[in-house]
A protein has these predicted regions:
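PLP-dependent amino-acid enzyme catalytic core
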Residues: 1-218
Length: 218
């Protein structure tokens, strides 16, 4: 059966492919599968969490039709929110900094977000800069009434990662022993891990130091 017709581009989020690693895995070694999150519209798994947060806020009235959204970010979360808000018709105010990659900031602007840049000290990220960005986002939300997604505290994103766990479970037909995820805030690792453990109690989340045994030596 061919690909189904999508009603809008947001339906292209998720249901990404699993790809087996072959050449770098020892013969008769473990089967290692990669989840190709680059297949999401902006090339990032953050599309999932951005859509989940906006959908939940719309559903319970925190975000009215055409209502504004604000968030502090400098990376893929900002790009994904810019994308989702553009499709859904929500003006987006991003609080960011010159400490982040210019390409990411330009991507957000191209997708229609308004950026407020908090100056860094020497171009580097510091705890103070993070606090300043959070404070600035809170001020914008307070003054304008915009919905603040507040990614560090927003539990709505867990629904996206639980759904991703369901995808993995179905794609592997339940044949999975461990799950590894590169993380920033670790929300994805927590959410996917929780989802998988609903079906497979005892699933391992091995630390990176344990992975060497899966690879061929150079």
């Amino acid at each position: 059966m061919g690909a189904t017709l999508k009603q809008d581009i947001l339906q292209c989020i998720g249901n990404t492919s699993l790809l087996p690693l072959r050449n770098i895995v020892p013969k008769n070694g473990s089967r290692i599968l990669l989840k190709l999150e680059s297949e999401n519209p902006t090339g990032s798994m953050k599309d999932r969490m951005a859509l989940a947060m906006i959908d939940a806020a719309e559903a319970d009235g925190r975000l009215a039709p055409g209502g504004s959204v604000v968030e502090y970010t400098g990376g893929s979360t900002g790009v994904s929110l810019s994308f989702v808000c553009a499709v859904k018709g929500h003006p987006l105010h991003i609080v960011s900094s010159d400490a982040f990659a210019r390409e990411k900031l330009d991507h957000m602007r191209i997708l229609g977000a308004t950026l407020q840049i908090v100056p860094s000290e020497g171009g580097g990220m510091t705890e103070k800069l993070t606090r300043d960005m959070i404070e600035a986002a809170g001020i914008v939300a307070g003054k304008t009434g915009a919905y603040w997604t507040d990614q560090m505290k927003n539990k709505d994103q867990m629904a996206a990662y639980h759904k991703m766990a369901e995808e993995i479970w179905k794609q592997t037909v339940g044949r999975i022993d461990g799950f590894v995820q590169s993380v920033g805030t670790a929300a994805s690792l927590r959410g996917i891990g929780e989802g998988l453990r609903q079906d497979l109690w005892g699933l391992m989340n091995p630390g990176p130091w344990t992975l060497k045994k899966f690879w061929k030596e150079p």
